[in-house]
Amino acid sequence: MYREYKPNILLAPYIETYWATDESLSGRQTLRILPDGDINVLFNLAENEVDIIKPFIPYIIGTKTTFSNVVHERADRMIGVRFRPCAISAYTKVPVYEFNNCRVDTSLFLSLFADFNSERLAEKEDEIERLNYIEEYLLGKLNCLNNIDKQFIYVAEYIRMTNGMVPVNKLLDKVCLSQRQFERQF
């Protein structure tokens, strides 16, 4: 079953939602994941070392540009943090496009979860305790965020609000940029 939880109001400019799933499967299933423009940080809560995503280690799941089929052969238990468009840039200096169509172990580079204590997450008894632990960690990082150009965030949100169906000239008028300025930044 899939559930969503709202973030703390201080994290709301960066995090769209937390989500959790615990699927009980009665055999092999293939799920089609459609591109949604989001970047997620994913925690696998199933303690199975065979999994591609190691248990309790945070992974960045980059923006998908095409659908992907994910094969599940047993029960899945995961927690995710879905970031708002461009907001993960506040937590890492790696350009967002570097994560496109990728699954990256956050311990491999300097990022928001570089010093995250996965063992403490594993010790938590239930989903709510784990979500609270992740949120407390993210709240603790608020004082060391990278600056993000507010105009950049507004452009990304506006494109998302219009489902990408906005002519470039209208977008430029809306965000008060010339085409040349827009091309330099985007």
Feature annotation, model-predicted:
Residues 186:
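DNA major-groove recognition helix of helix-turn-helix
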Residues 1-163, 167-169, 174-179:
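Alpha-helical bundle regulatory/interaction domains
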